[in-house]
A protein has these predicted regions:
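Bacterial N-terminal signal peptides that target proteins for export
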Residues: 2-18
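The feature captures the catalytic groove of carbohydrate-active enzymes
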Residues: 37-69, 176-199, 206, 232-354, ...
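Catalytic cores of carbohydrate-active enzymes
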Residues: 38, 47, 51-54, 58, ...
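Substrate-binding groove/exosite segments of carbohydrate-active enzymes
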Residues: 63-221, 225, 229, 318, ...
């Protein structure tokens, strides 16, 4: 009988060899792909740097532009921008150019200031160039400070915002009263840091999500707390039995939106000194700065001198905006105290993190219960319940863009968000805020809508665009979780219209005409709104957190761009680069779409989906 050969060792060796060969092929294939991705990263980075360099040269030649407020000018701004800003490129050349322009504009507003009050040197960020009568002594103004924090936080060098925060939170601006001059149109004295509404504590929180620094935070927390205490003491409704009791109030002027329609409706429904305003004549007294002189000359102003200041009514409003800012600040205080190693205990034995969380919840509940109108499906404005003159607790039944502010701060209860979602239909409606050239500040179907007057009762205001676009992005990304193509396209259309309004020689001004506008009006190179942050966080979905991780979830419609690159982004002391290409290999059939993320030049994550969330853990 022939003995059968034992083939097992041979087969085992064959299988082992095959496995090794297969593994080598897979590794080789993976290495080749990684090499392709790395080569494309190098190419896009170089292209973006070259484009930025050339465009800064172009921007520096523009005539009739304000001179820089600080040390960065045409002699040195190129090197500063190349070494500091997140690089960005896409297949849309308009948005590319505006992105780079906005950083060039921002560099002109980074100002050094020697404060004679405390003999310290600060970096501040200006809105207008020079020192306006309504500004702090440094020239900085609190009204756009929240937006400035959200944009400037993306610079690699963190010293600018740390110093800016220091100036407003514990420098002279935190306690020096706003100077009273011809532009001081209220009878309430307050520090420079509170002359206009703001959400600076939230802005500092947003900054620390990009550039964490627990030691600096520990030093700053008591001053952030004091900052909020000033808002609590001066700007809350004191009449305990009013509907708006305990809510935050402000003149619309010092909320940055003078001559608002909600104020118009409240004034018309007032008596006493404000019987001056009627449905037929209010435009003669409250429609732009050329009309307040008429009010100043009125019998009512003479009989009630404290009801007006230079013809502007001392009429306080409980607006969705200022209450949302308070919520954002309180929630930020809670988060920052929780992040701090020694969070502190208040006088009642409660942790400060819990204390501020409960206060934020109370503001949230009041906004939902008082300002939300179920019939209008919108957040409306009330007149303050403790107004000395004029209507109290009067609801102005008009939709204004400030009604979207709660979404900016993710203030809507997550489990109940669908009950508030109908408000966003007005963003896409020509009866609401949608117009040919851009977003309006009031609903167009209201009979008092007016986009021509210098008044925020219709005219476009980029400050509000920044609020609403982030609010809408938060609604799609954080509440709905998934979004339809038309929803993404609406956000993109608004961003593109805003970019296009900058013109061939980009410029950002104070206002635009939503129906026919081709360019911005007002002072050129004006820093009161965001754009880099709109691209980085809202559209491309780079989301920073206090933990050592980040996520990317673009809301970019897949059919709009062929590619984008976002890189040179400094985050938690790491360098981040992101590329999405619709087709990585044109020689292969079908789309080879891929989203790639590098950390410190190492490819760490990829996704074949543009719009699914990609999470990256930075922990070793």
């Amino acid at each position: 009988m022939n003995k059968l050969f034992n083939l097992s060792p041979i087969l085992s060796a064959y299988r082992l060899s095959f496995t090794v060969i297969l593994a080598c092929l897979i590794i080789s294939c993976s290495t080749q792909k990684s090499l392709v991705y790395d080569q494309e990263l190098k190419r896009m980075k170089t292209t973006s740097e070259n484009r930025l360099s050339a465009q800064v040269d172009e921007f520096n030649t523009y005539p009739n532009r304000p001179e820089s407020d600080g040390p960065f000018n045409k002699t040195n701004n190129k090197s500063f921008l190349l070494s500091n800003i997140p690089l960005f490129s896409s297949s849309d050349m308009t948005i590319n150019k505006v992105y780079n322009y906005r950083w060039w504009m921002i560099s002109k507003h980074l100002k050094t200031y020697h404060d004679p009050q405390d003999n310290k040197d600060y970096w501040v960020v200006t809105e207008f160039f020079g020192v306006k009568p309504w500004a702090s002594l440094s020239g900085a103004i609190t009204c756009p400070a929240g937006h400035q924090f959200y944009d400037v936080r993306w610079l690699r060098d963190e010293k600018f915002l740390k110093s800016y925060a220091d100036y407003f939170m514990r420098g002279s601006a935190s306690h020096l009263d706003q100077r009273e001059n011809g532009n001081f149109l209220t009878y309430m004295s307050r520090p420079e840091s509170h002359h206009f509404s703001s959400w600076m504590v939230d802005g500092i929180d947003a900054f620390l999500k990009i550039h964490p620094d627990k030691k600096w935070l520990h030093e700053m927390l008591p001053y952030l707390e004091k900052h909020q205490q000033v808002w609590d003491s001066l700007f809350t409704v004191r009449t305990s039995d009013s509907k708006t009791a305990g809510m935050y109030k402000i003149l619309d002027l010092y909320d940055g939106m003078e001559f608002s329609l909600s104020a118009v409706l409240g004034l018309i429904n007032s008596d006493g000194p404000y019987s001056l305003y009627t449905k037929d004549n209010w435009r003669n007294y409250y429609l732009g700065w050329e009309t307040t002189g008429n009010a100043e000359k009125s019998i009512q102003a003479k009989n009630y001198p404290k009801a007006f200041r230079k013809g502007y009514p001392d009429f306080y409003l409980v607006r969705p905006s200022v209450n949302s800012y308070a919520y954002g600040n309180l929630r930020a205080l809670s988060d920052l105290y929780r992040l701090n190693d020694s969070s502190g205990i208040n006088k009642n034995g409660q942790s400060k993190a819990d204390y501020y969380a409960s206060r934020a919840t109370k503001v949230q509940q009041q906004v939902m219960n008082v300002l939300w109108n179920k019939d209008d499906q919108f957040f409306n404005t009330y007149s303050a319940g403790d107004n000395i003159f004029g209507a109290r607790d009067f609801e102005a039944r008009v939709r204004e863009s400030v009604g979207y502010t709660p979404w900016y701060f993710n203030m809507i209860p997550v489990n109940d968000y669908k009950n508030y979602s109908k408000a966003w239909e007005m963003l896409a409606s020509r009866k609401g805020f949608f117009n040919t050239s851009g977003m309006t500040t009031a609903e167009q179907q209201h009979p008092y809508y007016n986009e021509q007057a210098y008044a925020w009762n219709g005219r476009g205001w980029p400050f509000e665009n920044s609020i609403v676009y982030k609010g809408y992005a938060n609604y799609l990304r954080n509440y709905k979780k998934s979004s339809t193509l038309p929803e993404k396209e609406l956000l993109y259309e608004y961003v593109y219209k805003l970019a296009k309004m900058h013109g061939d020689k980009p410029n950002i001004g104070e206002w635009y005409i939503p129906s026919t506008g081709k360019e911005f009006g007002g002072e050129a190179d004006y820093f009161h709104s965001t754009f880099p942050d709109i691209i980085i966080e809202d559209l491309l979905g780079f989301k920073g957190v206090h933990e050592n991780s980040f996520s990317v979830k673009p809301l970019l419609p897949k059919n709009k761009w062929d590619y984008f690159y976002l890189g040179n982004l400094r985050y938690h002391n790491h360098d981040i680069d992101i590329i999405w290409k619709k087709d990585w290999d044109a020689n292969k059939p079908g789309e080879q779409g891929k989203l790639c993320v590098w950390v410190d030049n190492k490819l760490v994550a990829t996704s074949s989906s543009l719009n699914e969330q990609l999470n990256v853990d930075l922990n070793p």
